[in-house]
């Protein structure tokens, strides 16, 4: 949402719940942004953030209601490799904290970072397998080059 700050953007889902005060809405939004690594970008607008940061705002917006399941549809689809692995690392951390994440991707390599892979084709389940050798996105991230501006 181009005209809102990160914190305003994340507050939006809570606006529909009259039981949540403005202070609680703000506090929960700040906590969600901190959880995704954007505690220092609370008042930045989308034109002041990278694609990866905007994706993190979207994830924080999904987390602000404390869901038991998070649906991430092509969450790394339009991101560069390094940013994709930053997002995957975040998802693995959320999963380690007990959150169920349904991660939709067209990239089979990305699926090796999940605990279970369900392959669909033409709307039908073609494969359903547990991954006994889950790769660590954080470890892969350490091997990727850091951009010169960081």
Language model features with spans:
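Glycine-rich, phosphate-binding/catalytic loops in enzymes
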Residues: 89, 119-121, 135-136
């Amino acid at each position: 949402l181009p005209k809102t700050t990160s914190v305003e953007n994340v507050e939006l889902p809570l606006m529909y719940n009259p039981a949540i005060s403005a202070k609680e809405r703000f506090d929960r939004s700040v906590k969600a942004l901190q959880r995704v690594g954007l505690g220092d970008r609370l008042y930045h607008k989308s034109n002041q953030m990278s694609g990866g940061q905007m994706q993190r705002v979207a994830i924080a917006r999904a987390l602000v209601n404390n869901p038991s399941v998070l649906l991430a549809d092509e969450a790394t689809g339009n991101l560069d490799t390094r940013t994709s692995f930053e997002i995957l690392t975040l998802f693995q951390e959320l999963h380690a904290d007990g959150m169920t994440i349904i991660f939709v991707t067209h990239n089979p390599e990305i699926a090796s970072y999940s605990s279970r892979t369900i392959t669909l084709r033409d709307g039908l389940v073609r494969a359903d397998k547990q991954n006994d050798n889950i790769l660590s996105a954080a470890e892969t991230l350490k091997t990727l080059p850091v951009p010169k501006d960081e």
